[in-house]
Amino acid sequence: MWNLRDKYAIAGIGYTDFTKQSGRTTRSLASEACLKAINDAGLDADEVDGIISYNMGDSDPGIAVATELGLPRAHYMNDVFAGGNVAVMVMLTATAVIEAGLAKNVLCFRSMNGRSGVRLGGSRDQNAYGFSQYTAPFGWMTYPQAMAMWCRRHMSKYGTTSAQLGAIAVNCRKNASMNPRAMQRKPMTLDDYFASRPIVDPFRMYDICLESDGACAVLVTSSAHARDLKQKPVYITGGAYGGGPSQGFSFEDIMRWPDPAHNCFPYIADDLWKSAGLGPKDMDFAEIYDCFTYSTIMALEGMGFCKEGEGGPYVESGAIALAGSLPVNTHGGLLSEAYIHGLNHTIEAVEQLRGQAGERQVANASIGLVTAGAMSCGSAMVIRT
């Protein structure tokens, strides 16, 4: 179990514009976000000595970004081949790297041209490799297809409705309307949600995250060092990564999953709350990995904000609204702000805790939850001021 409570902190954040057509390389986007994070922390580039990135073969490695930025002291580099499930894990890894003495100031970044470049589930080779050889020949080629099956299971088992999924989409859009960097700011009603075109049953267009070009970066350092830097430190209080007994994505792995009415979070929630010494009721807000509306329901249930099967009524009650008992995805989430594979959730959480969120600021926010991942494995952290 991660046991470095409050020893490390987020000292800087950076991000590019989020667009559909960046007209730039992923290296250029990453470099901009990383340089902004360095400047935000009040550091010089030569003080950064660690870089961790994650990608799915669609971006540049950390060493390329280190070269682009001219970092002379990059002693530790790690490129994690994974998706949104590690959007928090990379920062937990940064704390372990610093604890081990391998680096002092570690940049974590994700850069992607997810709309204009390599699109998840987009064009592919005529041959199937890896786990896709068990799925692609049967027409299962995209994440919406997989998650739709899981969602339908929850609907069948607990009576979850499309209107409840729509409540999540509408809430995200309302929050995004107050976010200058959000890609989708136009107000949306529940009627608009139901009018959006079907994609894969039971999902409509507004149940599925955006495709985005952009980059985000987060700088992690020791809490003692962070207190001497430019910004108010945001302490990493608790963290966890993991999943259940079957963490792959082939048909065989999916069929082994105990019950798609829940995902990875029931398996890591206890470790998270124990590592933080806190519980769900202590959170002022939550930034939930929402690649789909349904993933929000699974995370809220799995993390203990409501019981399994009660996520639909919970979101429909207004609890997740900005003025609710647990404001969720205050920036608009992956559904309305942008899809930078989840790292933009940490950007928003840090801004909330610094009191820099403007019109969408959660009153007196001092502690929050960030989750990453939607299916069989994921990560999460509690951060505070």
Where is each model-derived feature located?
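Conserved active-site "lid/cap" helical segment
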Residues: M1-N85, T93, H154-T161, M183-T189, ...
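Electropositive phosphate-/nucleotide-binding environments in soluble metabolic enzymes
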Residues: R24-S31, S59, V88, M141-A148, ...
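Short acidic, glycine/serine/threonine-rich loops at helix termini
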Residues: S22-G23, G117-G122, S177-R181, Q247-S250, ...
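Condensing-enzyme catalytic core mediating Claisen C-C bond formation in acyl metabolism
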Residues: M1-R24, A167, I199-N263, Y267, ...
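Active-site-proximal alpha-helical scaffold in enzymes
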Residues: F81-M112, P144-M178, V218-A224, E337-A357
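Beta-strand segments within the central parallel beta-sheet cores of soluble alpha/beta enzyme folds
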Residues: A45-Y54, Y76-D79, V106-S111, A163-V170, ...
